[in-house]
Curated annotation (Swiss-Prot):
UniProt topology in membrane: Peripheral membrane protein
Subcellular location: Endoplasmic reticulum membrane; Golgi apparatus membrane
Name the record gives this protein: Protein transport protein Sec16B
Function: Plays a role in the organization of the endoplasmic reticulum exit sites (ERES), also known as transitional endoplasmic reticulum (tER). Required for secretory cargo traffic from the endoplasmic reticulum to the Golgi apparatus. Involved in peroxisome biogenesis. Regulates the transport of peroxisomal biogenesis factors PEX3 and PEX16 from the ER to peroxisomes.
Family, similarity comment: Belongs to the SEC16 family.
Keywords annotated in UniProt: Endoplasmic reticulum, ER-Golgi transport, Golgi apparatus, Membrane, Peroxisome biogenesis, Protein transport, Transport
CDD domains assigned to the protein according to its UniProt record, in alphabetical order: ACE1-Sec16-like (cd09233)
Taxonomic source organism: Gallus gallus
Bias (Low complexity): 781-795
Biased composition annotated in UniProt, kind: Pro residues: 1-10, 856-871
Central conserved domain (CCD): annotated segments: 228-669
GO process terms (BP): endoplasmic reticulum to Golgi vesicle-mediated transport; Golgi organization; peroxisome organization; protein localization to endoplasmic reticulum exit site; protein transport
PANTHER family: PROTEIN TRANSPORT PROTEIN SEC16B, RGPR-RELATED
Listed Polar residues bias regions: 838-848
Length: 929
């Protein structure tokens, strides 16, 4: 019956030979059916537990015979290949082109129509399964297949049901299965379910169905399982680069055939010999900060770069050559230079003196009478015009004098300007009003070309930034160097004006792509070097724009040029260095190591370490760590170290590397212990704290004239002894590797504050059931340090009055701290300007501004203070259930007091507020866990 056929009624029973199969029921007389077995129809020639004559059915088999099993889904493969009959069965049993229905299809049939096929030894000898199953394909005919049937049943049951073997199929002595061990040991049903997905290694029939598919994979590899292809089908050559400039190569071999690997070591310096990059690295005499280097070698290298890499036919090449010439000048003069020296260098590099076209003088509104002063000449017969008479210099001066005879100064001034008598005009106008002098001066400068350096000079002398500084770099303006030479050689009284003019010229050139020219101007203006990626910085590497990609920015030529400039500064000041440049030195050292020059790279590492060890321990921790990693790989390339290394001490290292490693470890420990420094470091108030109480975290306060102590230990519940001195020595917070920190330094870092809401974790209690009061907000105690002769009672009373007289200010300060505590702008928040009560602004109290920002002292610290007559109305809005040490005595808390909370709750608040900076909260309130 096909799955698409409609269900049919049970046919009439007729006698028919057993084993005729389903094909005869379809193409011939319907076979008789015997409703004796419920479940799936057994396959012809297969083993059936209901007809096994060798042994009785077990409990598991009885269970299987009464329940229809459903096959595993194979996602598109409906018929497992081992369910189809072999070719021999089709030939002997008239199967023709019809195939055996899968078990899942047989389950759809009526259980009353199931009839087992008769099975005999002769039928078994025919064996339709021959040629398919691996255990039956090679077996001779006529052999008893009972053991094979048992193995088939056992493997089929594991494949369909997914359970372990019960140990009865093979009939051979074996170890109990995993499922049986679980049942005997009394494990729960979860162990039974787990055993369904675990193959028992003690089952002997695991090889019965190696070619069959099963969702439960065995522990060992299957023959027909899909194997991952090899990454390399043929023997290959593994290659790696060593830190000492070595190339490690493993020759191809076959380890399975017993071939030993052959390792070859090649020098990268030899392999890369003749390449452009290596020749460029070897030509540079770096590192320059060494004793055996002479500055002549550096000057020679600069001149070689000018001749080889600078194209003087282009403006960019001339600008690059100018930078190299400036470095030569600095080396020759030991790092010192003046404006006139640079001006001479600028004019030497110019190809020729440009000729600037002069303009005709512009006459103002004052003019002369043409008919009175014009001298007419002979009429030209060709053109019909009367040409003017060309007057000599003497005649021009004579007419200027005649005008002054008649007192016509304005006319004389205009005559002098028309005839280029600028000396006479300027002197005459200087003795007149200032407006006339400015008019003559502007008329004189208007006769000069716009791009004339004289125009730049006169504009600078006039007290304004020259126009050339804002417009240079264009084709119509010509070369920018004469203008810079004028600015450098002629310093005006206002040095700020001269500096701004040079910087403006550099910015103009940089905006038009002339990076080398702009950096030349920046060097003349003493602009400091910045960092890559910071657009506000004007330069990071000399002659290279830091606004382009890093690979194009950090070139070898730019790093070498920058190192020469640093060397020139060291010639003048031996201890000077460029701190932002050290990271590029490390990059250059790594490139040297990559090109097979490890000894030279190690010298760079030593110089960088020397600079870092002179700095603050927290200046550049990342650079120090990367430098340590590279130096540890290159340390054995030092020839001096190899000569001094004894045979019994193979771990000898240079001293600078040991110091650098210690410095890196110190920085790492500081970073790891920063959130927990308050818990790990002993604090001065530990000896005065009450046992069973948590310590108060550090609290900065204002540095007033009398505020020498900003921490007060908890006071016992019975009150302080009136004869006891409660003054505390000045507090010094110990920080790892730094030493004691003053109170002024602590005040520079504001605290982070937060008030928990109702429902948060309560404070821990001691053995007496009293909760531990811990300060978690910034508060400034109004108590001051008193001498042994002063009484502590007066101080406590004053504190009580101060805290009780200003409850509104305290509550406002608390809410203000809560709103700004975990925000970044809270670090820069200015002090609120408020008017305080006279008691809060006395000489013995802290600063009023800071007192408004902080909460008062804890109520448990002043039990002897008298509360005010009326309770404060600001107690009710507080949304937290606070309990303090006063609960043990049954006393009510003092009115107007702001309750405190446990700092252990800060971690919970930070977790509930993901937008808050967790790092700051952990730093100020370490996690006690």
């Amino acid at each position: 019956m096909e799955p698409w056929d409609p269900p049919q009624l049970p046919p009439v029973r007729h006698s028919h030979a057993a084993g005729s199969g389903r094909a005869e029921g379809r193409h011939g007389t319907p076979p008789p059916w015997r409703p004796i077995i419920s479940g799936p129809l057994p396959r012809p020639g297969s083993w059936d537990p209901g007809r096994d004559l060798h042994r009785p059915a077990s409990q598991a088999e009885s269970y299987e015979s009464g329940h229809a099993f459903r096959a595993y889904s194979r996602q598109g493969y409906e018929d497992p290949h081992w369910q189809y009959p072999g070719a021999a069965y089709r030939d002997n049993h008239a199967y023709q082109s019809h195939q055996w229905q899968p078990t899942a299809w047989q389950g759809n049939r009526d259980v009353t129509q199931v009839k087992p096929h008769g099975k005999s030894t002769t039928y078994r000898d025919q064996h339709y399964y021959r040629g398919y199953h691996p255990n039956l394909a090679a077996s001779p005919l006529g052999q008893d297949r009972s053991q094979t049937y048992d193995a088939y049943k056992e493997g089929s049951r594991r494949s369909w049901a997914g359970v372990s073997n019960l140990g009865e199929a093979s009939g051979q002595p074996q170890q109990p299965s995993l499922l049986q061990q679980y049942r005997e040991s009394g494990l729960s049903s979860s162990g039974y379910e787990l055993s369904q997905y675990i193959r028992d290694g003690a089952e002997p029939n695991d090889t019965a169905f190696l070619g069959g598919w099963s969702p439960v994979q065995g522990g060992g590899p299957l023959e027909s399982a899909v194997m991952a292809p090899h990454k390399f089908l043929q023997p290959h050559v593994p290659v790696c680069l060593g830190a000492g400039g070595q190339l490690v190569l493993v020759c191809p071999h076959r380890p399975t055939e017993g071939q030993l690997p052959l390792v070859e070591l090649h020098s990268l310096e030899v392999i890369l010999q003749g390449t452009t990059d290596q020749e460029e690295l070897q030509a540079f005499p770096g590192p320059l900060a060494r004793e055996d280097l002479h500055k002549v070698d550096v000057m020679t290298f600069c001149q070689q770069k000018i001749a080889s890499s600078c194209d003087l036919s282009t403006q960019r090449g001339r600008d690059s050559a100018l930078l190299w010439k400036l470095l030569v000048l600095l080396c020759r003069q030991n790092g010192s230079m003046v404006g006139s020296d640079v001006a001479e260098l600028l004019m030497q590099d110019c190809r020729q003196q440009e000729r600037y076209k002069r303009q005709e003088p512009a006459v103002g509104p004052v003019s002369l009478a043409d008919e009175e002063w014009r001298q007419l000449g002979t009429l030209d017969l060709i053109t019909g015009e009367v040409p003017p008479v060309v007057e000599t210099q003497a005649q021009i001066v004579e007419k200027f004098t005649k005008l002054l005879y008649y007192g016509r100064k304005k006319d004389a001034l205009v005559w002098a300007m028309r005839n280029q008598l600028w000396g006479h005009a300027l002197f005459l106008s200087s003795k007149m009003d200032p407006r006339t002098y400015s008019w003559v001066l502007s008329g004189f400068t208007s006769t000069l070309a716009t791009n004339d350096p004289l125009q730049t000079f006169f504009q600078l002398m006039s007290g304004r930034i020259p126009q050339a500084a804002q417009s240079c770099g264009d084709a119509k303006w010509g070369d920018w160097r004469p203008h810079l030479a004028v600015l450098l050689s002629n310093k005006v009284g206002d040095m700020e004006l001269n500096h701004r003019a040079i910087v403006t010229m550099g910015d103009t050139l940089a905006g038009k792509g002339a990076v080398e020219a702009a950096h030349f101007c920046y060097l003349m203006a003493d602009i400091p070097f910045g960092y890559f990626g910071v657009k506000a910085d004007r330069m990071a590497l000399l002659g290279s724009s830091h606004r382009q990609a890093f690979t194009q920015f950090a070139t070898k030529e730019a790093i070498q040029r920058m190192e020469i400039f640093e060397y020139c500064q060291q010639l003048r000041h031996p201890t000077s260095f460029l701190l932002p440049f050290q990271v590029y030195k490390l990059l250059y050292a790594s490139r040297l190591a990559d090109h097979g020059l490890p000894a030279q790279a190690l010298l760079y590492c030593e110089q960088i370490a020397t600079v870092l060890l002179q700095q603050d321990p927290t200046s550049h921790p990342v650079l120090a760590q990367q430098l340590t990693k590279l130096a540890e790989r290159l340390k054995l390339c030092d020839p001096l170290l190899l000569l001094e290394m004894p045979e019994q001490d193979p771990v000898l290292e240079p001293q600078w590397l040991l110091q650098l490693r210690t410095y890196c470890q110190h920085c790492q420990v500081q970073d790891d212990l920063a959130p927990e420094v308050a818990l790990t470091q002993p604090e001065p108030w530990d000896t005065t704290a009450t046992p069973g109480r948590e310590m108060v975290h550090e609290q900065p306060h204002s540095d007033g004239p009398h505020d020498e102590q900003w921490h007060q230990p908890p006071v016992p519940l019975q009150g302080p002894d009136p004869h006891q001195d409660v003054s505390i020595p000045p507090l010094e917070v110990a920080v790892l590797g730094v030493g004691p920190i003053s109170q002024e330094e602590l005040c520079t870092e504001p605290s982070l504050q937060a008030v928990p809401t109702a429902g948060d974790a309560e404070e821990p209690q001691d053995a007496h059931g009293v909760q531990q009061p811990v300060l978690a907000e910034l508060q400034e105690l109004s108590t001051r340090a008193r001498s042994a002769s002063e009484s502590s009672t007066a101080s406590l009373e004053e504190d009580s009055q101060t805290s009780s007289d200003s409850p509104a200010e305290e509550l406002e300060g608390t809410s203000e701290d809560k709103s700004f505590g975990f925000r970044w702008f809270g670090w820069f928040r200015s002090k609120p300007q408020k008017e305080t009560s006279p008691k809060a602004t006395t000489s013995g109290s802290p600063t009023p501004g800071l007192q408004d920002r902080r909460s008062p002292s804890p109520p448990g610290a002043v039990p002897s203070a008298q509360p005010p007559a009326s309770p404060s109305p600001y107690r009710n809005p507080v949304s937290i259930d606070m309990k303090g040490p006063w609960d043990a005595d049954g006393h009510e808390p003092l009115p107007g007091m702001v309750p405190l909370f446990n700092p252990a709750q800060v971690s919970q608040l930070a977790a509930a507020r993901p937008t808050q900076p967790r790092l700051l909260s952990q730093r100020r309130y370490p996690n006690p866990l």
